Amino acid sequence: MEPGAAELYDQALLGILQHVGNVQDFLRVLFGFLYRKTDFYRLLRHPSDRMGFPPGAAQALVLQVFKTFDHMARQDDEKRKKELEEKIRKKEEEAKALPAAETEKVAVPVPVQEVEIDAAADLSGPQEVEKEEPPGSQDPEHTVTHGLEKAEAPGTVSSAAEGPKDPPVLPRIQEQFQKNPDSYNGAIRENYIWSQDYTDLEVRVPVPKHVMKGKQVSVALSSGTIRVAMVEENGERVLMEGKLTHKINTESSLWSLEPGRCVLVNLSKVGEYWWSAILEGEEPIDIDKINKERSMATVDEEEQAVLDRLTFDYHQKLQGKPQSHELKVHEMLKKGWDAEGSPFRGQRFDPAMFNISPGAVQF
């Protein structure tokens, strides 16, 4: 699928929503489509059935999808709450720092002031306030020197932050990645988050809040590379770029924009194996600590039928009831039991009369 084609889905769905006018009727349209055009509402009552879902499975699937996005919404609420609290805290710190800056009469550059609030104000602010002398007793040279010392301290912190070993702000342990659905079986990196299942990968590249339309971003995918950029007036600003650690299927890979949040890129794996990293040079994750269970969504129809039959047989065996191979033979025998000319016609059919080996039945 060509980059940008995923936006067609948003436009189509938005058109439906605008036409019906409310979410309830919008959901009716979606589930009506599933009812008319798919086997979503068809019950899988027998292991030999090749279409439909076991009783309760379709409802559980809908609930699972709902819970997934409900969890994401709760995370968004928590994130907005933390951002608001952080803004309030910064404003309070700026208000406290303003009188001291006016007393010293030193113009502190804005970037330095921001770093000072984050790194130095919490640690040394109270002690410096206690040691301040009355304005009349301060020497001008001392005042200027004092201001330069304060300007250099944040720079030291900034240079330390730019070193090869950043502070442990991002989680580094796989157990922490597993707790976040966006980094499940993946990792959180400086400029993107990725997760994976048996057949696909999902990469989230954060964008500024003003990025609301697909034309404001540029995504280029090849079998071995990825590039995500933000379109600006003077060109493009690259958000993520590099060589993939494995090949992808570009025809079934796609991307979309979550307005004001991130570019969501779905990569389709060429082979069914677990990735330890998205980009070459990226710190690999510990494959032994991820969940390697294969999702039922990745199982094809034939494999799904076998799994359903084995599950059915297991529960039947626990309850002492006939298994699928026995039921199939019983059904065949029952048809001929009362047939014209049968010596058993008129007698009650008793399945217990027959001992049927599983190998005697071909599914």
Curated annotation (Swiss-Prot):
Q: Which residues form the CS domain?
A: 187-279
- Please note every region of biased composition (Basic and acidic residues): 128-143
* One CC-aspect GO term: cytoplasmic dynein complex
| GO BP: any one term | protein localization to pericentriolar material
Q: List the disulfide bonds.
A: none
Give me the ranges of the annotated region Disordered: 120-143
What the entry lists under Gene3D superfamilies is as follows: 2.60.40.790
Which sequence positions carry the modification called Phosphoserine? 342, 357
Q: Please indicate which superkingdom the organism of origin belongs to.
A: Eukaryota
The alphabetical list of record keywords is: Phosphoprotein
PANTHER family listed in its UniProt record? NUCLEAR MOVEMENT PROTEIN NUDC, NUDC DOMAIN-CONTAINING PROTEIN 3
What is the protein's name according to its record? NudC domain-containing protein 3
Q: Which organism is it from?
A: Mus musculus (Mouse)
Gene name of the record: Nudcd3
